[in-house]
Amino acid sequence: MADYQGKNVVIIGLGLTGLSCVDFFLARGVTPRVMDTRMTPPGLDKLPEAVERHTGSLNDEWLMAADLIVASPGIALAHPSLSAAADAGIEIVGDIELFCREAQAPIVAITGSNGKSTVTTLVGEMAKAAGVNVGVGGNIGLPALMLLDAECELYVLELSSFQLETTSSLQAVAATILNVTEDHMDRYPFGLQQYRAAKLRIYENAKVCVVNADDALTMPIRGADERCVSFGVNMGDYHLNHQQGETWLRVKGEKVLNVKEMKLSGQHNYTNALAALALADAAGLPRASSLKALTTFTGLPHRFEVVLEHNGVRWINDSKATNVGSTEAALNGLQVDGTLHLLLGGDGKSADFSPLARYLNGDNVRLYCFGRDGAQLAALRPEVAEQTETMEQAMRLLAPRVQPGDMVLLSPACASLDQFKNFEQRGNEFARLAKELG
């Protein structure tokens, strides 16, 4: 455990994570200073009076006088103020690094462009099914520091690339990169390999690395080694097996579960289940309770969630598809009897949308593109695309056209922040309109 006594600590970024950092230091007899570029950041009213605060900008004077800077994942390490501090030899960490220095129980660590919240939650459910006292959080749910507890027997953390950039003490019992596709390119000017390099930090000092056999970018730089266990659709130690119209989860040739016993559906969710099972096995959880958890887990909201089935039409909310890879995962192997009415749009974060084109070739696809990058998305297949300003306009346009056997899918391939507070608000709006129009 690290000793912070007498240290001049500056925390950048408030919100729930920032407050958890403040509480962490106060509990150790250190009063940090806090700054946030927002004038009235969330959590400002909960900050103890003794804590000095600076809002509306970064305070370079405070930063250059600090012994330790705890940076929110929301601020890029390339920011000139942080670069200057790093050049001056000032240590810069994040909340996950603070957590890793203190945690006494094993950690399962999960990252990836898509599927990480589902897999994190699923491994947590597997641990609970085994009667293990588990703490689940990080980039999902509770900030990691709020999970620190002497009673905890296992931690399951979802970690973003931004969190991993400031973490060096992670020693996971099992770690995975589920997949690597373009995301956050606005934060990674050197492209996909720079983004991948941040993700790869999760494997440093990991006991077992769970890699995706279908995605070479998830492999450690030096290639797979004896620490690696793999999962994949048709390849890998954990894979899918198709026999006589049935699909099974299979581990090293042994069939362990028929997917019809699972509440989750879709090929991307079956591979998520394989990854979760590989992590649970590596963490020493009993296989039987892990499989039981797979049969009861219903999935997370806004992730390929069926919000309405009416008159033979399925309305599916996949608002969490905030990047191209996530929408690809939803479309890959998708079975629709009639026409797919696909809603795309929002803020594409400088991504290349062209990988989606191959899924949009059929006669039974109609595109409804909205938001900041709607025109770019409509250009993928202009002859079947319509462009509107908002998602609501798009849904009112498509509603009279749907027939029994059709599917209406919101899988936007974009962030929501151009028109919504977050992807949850976008998904809730879709669900509300589906119930009104369907």
Swiss-Prot record:
Pfam families registered for this protein in UniProt: Mur_ligase_C, Mur_ligase_M, MurD-like_N
One Gene Ontology term of the molecular function aspect: ATP binding
Major localisation: cytoplasm
Family of this protein: Belongs to the MurCDEF family.
Pathway: Cell wall biogenesis; peptidoglycan biosynthesis
Enzyme class label: ligase
Catalytic function, reaction form: UDP-N-acetyl-alpha-D-muramoyl-L-alanine + D-glutamate + ATP = UDP-N-acetyl-alpha-D-muramoyl-L-alanyl-D-glutamate + ADP + phosphate + H(+)
Gene Ontology CC entries for this record: cytoplasm
GO biological-process terms attached to the record: cell division; cell wall organization; peptidoglycan biosynthetic process; regulation of cell shape
InterPro entries in UniProt: Mur-like_cat_sf, Mur_ligase_C, Mur_ligase_C_dom_sf, Mur_ligase_cen, MurD
Subcellular location: Cytoplasm
Residue positions binding ATP: G112, S113, N114, G115, K116, S117, T118
Function: Cell wall formation. Catalyzes the addition of glutamate to the nucleotide precursor UDP-N-acetylmuramoyl-L-alanine (UMA).
Species assigned in the record: Shigella boydii serotype 4 (strain Sb227)
Keywords: ATP-binding, Cell cycle, Cell division, Cell shape, Cell wall biogenesis/degradation, Cytoplasm, Ligase, Nucleotide-binding, Peptidoglycan synthesis
Record carries keyword Cytoplasm: yes
Keyword GTP-binding found: no
Annotated NCBIfam families: murD (TIGR01087)
EC number: 6.3.2.9
Protein name as catalogued: UDP-N-acetylmuramoylalanine--D-glutamate ligase
